[in-house]
C-alpha cells in the first residue's frame, strides 16, 4: 500500500512534528543524554495555513525529517521520502500532549531551530475569555493567569459560585451543614489534579503539606476502601487489599520537567506480582497443599512459572516491555509461553476454587480477583496493544468474557465497581451496570489497583468546593484574573465555514447586578472551622446584589435554567475587542444550545464532528443523599468477631465503598466533616454520603420557564425513590444498625426546630438529583469515546475546549480528566504547564 510520505515519517517516529509558522523546539522535548531513550514534547494543534491567534497570516512549511534510528535489523527506513519540502494541510491532527520514541535517535530538522514560547501579538497581552467555573475551566484559567506578562484572563460563570459538579454550599437553616452535589474524593492516581492543587495552594498563600503528610493540608488519606458483594444471598463487605506505598502524590518525577517523563508502560509486572503473591497466600492460607498438587500436574510448576514471569518482566526495561506487549503472539515464542502459563494457572485455579468459592466468602472474593487479573494480563498480551483506546468499541465485561473470564465473575464487585464508579448503567429497568468502553474501564481498574501514589484514595479535608474551588478563586484573583459571576453562556457566533470557521462572538445572559464598583464577594463571612478556607453559600449573598431582595422573595435559583427569571440583560463578547482566544469549559449537557451553529445541518458552520460528539455521547442523571446519625459507626456497621475474621479489620468504618444495590451503589463515610459544620452539642456521630445514577441516556427538557416545575418534580421523584431503596436495603448496608425502619429514622439527626417524627426526619436530610443540563455526568459507552474532541481540536479558530467530556487520557468523568483537559487547553495556547502527566496506555 502506498502511504503518504509524511504518514511514513509519522508512523516511523510515533510522533508528529510541531509547526506553527515559526519552527519551535519545545523545552519539554529535549533529550538529555544517550541513556534516555524517551523523547517527550508538548504537541499543539498544527497551524499550517490561515491566520494565527493574533490574526497574522500563516504559511507554514514542513520539511522532511532526517532521522537515524537504532532499530537494529528489525526495521528499515521506508523508501521514497520526498526530497523536496512538503506543503500540506493534511498534517493537522487531534493528537495532543506527550509522545515518545522508543529507541535512541538523532533527529535533524532542516532550517533554524530555536527555543521559544508563543509570543503575544502586537506588544500586548493576549486576552483570554474562559467560559465555565468547574475544575477544567479553572485549571485552564489558572495556568494562563499565572503567566501575567502574556495573558489577561477573564472567567465567566453562571450563578454565584465556582465548582460546576463540584459545587456545594452551607445550609444556613441547618447548622451550616455541608450539602454537596454528590460523593467526591481524589483517587491516588490523580497526579495532575493533586499537583495542580498543590500549585494553586501555593499561589493562594496556603500549604498543601503539613506535619501529617505531603497533602494533608487539603486531604485526609482514606485507608478504608472496599466493596459490597452479594454472596450466598447476603451482602458482604470486603476491604480491598491495597495498602499505602511510599510514592508522594502529585510529585513530578525526577527530571520530567526537563523532558524525562516517568515510564508509561502498562503495569504488567505489577499484575504478575500481585497474582504470584495472591497465589502464595491462597496456598499458605488453608494449611494443605492441594493447589501445589494441581500446579505440579501442569507443564511447568506454578511457583517456578510465576517466578520466571515476574523475573523476566523485572529484567526488561519499559521500552523493551512495551515492544514486547505490541509484538503479535505469532511472532514471539516468549509471548506464547507467557500466555500459555497464564492460561494454565487460571485453569488450575478454576479447578481448585470450584467448591471452595461456593462455600467460602473469602475464597469467592479471592478467586474473582485472581481470575480478573489473569484475564486482563492474558487479554492485553493477546490483543498486543498499548493503546487502550483501541479497545473502546467493546464493553469491558464482554471483553473479559471473550478472554476467558468465568461467567460467575461477570457480576463480581471486583469488576462492577469500575462500572459503578463511572456510573455505567443500563438505559432501562431494572437498574444494572452496563455499557462501559473497555479501554476506559481497564485503564481505570489498573490505575486504581496499581497506579496510586501514597494511598488508594484521599477524602477532602473540608467540603469539595472549600478544599478545591476556594483556593482556585484565591489563586486566580492573586494572579489578576477577573471572575465574572452571574454570567450564563447562551451561545456563540461563528464566522466562516469549513476550514475557515472562526469564533466571532460569545453571547452571555447577565443574571444579576453587583452593587457598587467592587467585585462580588462569593463567600460566607462567618463560617469557618479552624484552618478551613472560606465557605460558599447555598444561595447568593443577596445583600451584594441590586436585585437581591427580589431574588430572595421569589426564591429564584440562578443555577436553574428553568427558572422564571429573564436576568437583567445581555452581554456580547467580540473577538478582537473583548477577547483574542476563548476557552469553552461548559459541561457537555449544556452545550447543544450554546454551539447550535455547529450542530444544525442547515447551518453553513455545521461540523459533523460536533454533531457526533453531542448526539452520540450519552449522559446520565446522578443522584445523592446525605444522612446524619446520632449513632456512631460502631453501632451501624458490623464489627462482630465473624466480621473481623472475614475482613481482617476490626475498624467499623467503611470509608469509601461501592457495589451495592442500584440506584445508590456507592457510600462514603464522611463523619470528619461534622467538625467543620456548626451543630450544637451533642454533634452527629456518623455522616454517610450515598450516591448513584438513574437510567442512562438522560434527556432533559430544553431550558426555559415553560419547564419551571421540572426540577421540583425530579427532586420529589428522587426522594421517593431513595425512601423506597432505604426501606428495602438499610439492613444490608447498615448491617449492625436498627432492624426496624422506623428505628433507623429515629436514629437520624435533624436540625433544631419543630419536632419531626418518622419520614419527616428523612426529608430533613440532604438530597440532590442532577436535573440541570450542566449537572449531567458524561458516560463512556462502547463506541462513543472516539467522538470526543481534543482540547485544541474545536475546528473553530480562536476556540479551545476544556472539560472531562473532551479527549483526554482518561476519557471519563472525573476531576483528573477535567484537570488534564484544562492543562492541555492552556498548553495548546502557551506551552505551559511544561509537564502534564500522561497515563501512557
Give the positions of each predicted feature.
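Dinucleotide-binding Rossmann-like beta1-alpha1 core, especially the glycine-rich loop
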Residues: 174-308, 315, 323-351
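Hydrophobic residues within alpha-helices
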Residues: 140-144, 472, 825
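Active-site/ligand-binding neighborhood in enzyme catalytic cores
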Residues: 44-46, 50, 55, 280-568, ...
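C-terminal lid/capping helical subdomain adjacent to the catalytic/cofactor pocket in oxidative enzymes
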Residues: 3-59, 70, 75-80, 84-88, ...
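Extreme N-terminal leader/targeting segments of oxidoreductases
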Residues: 3-128, 146-150, 541-570
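N-terminal Rossmann-like FAD-binding beta1-loop-alpha1 element of flavoenzymes
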Residues: 126-154
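Glycine-rich FAD pyrophosphate-binding loop
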Residues: 145-170
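C-terminal segments that line or cap access tunnels to active or ligand-binding sites in enzymes
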Residues: 374-377, 383-386, 443-463, 467-474, ...
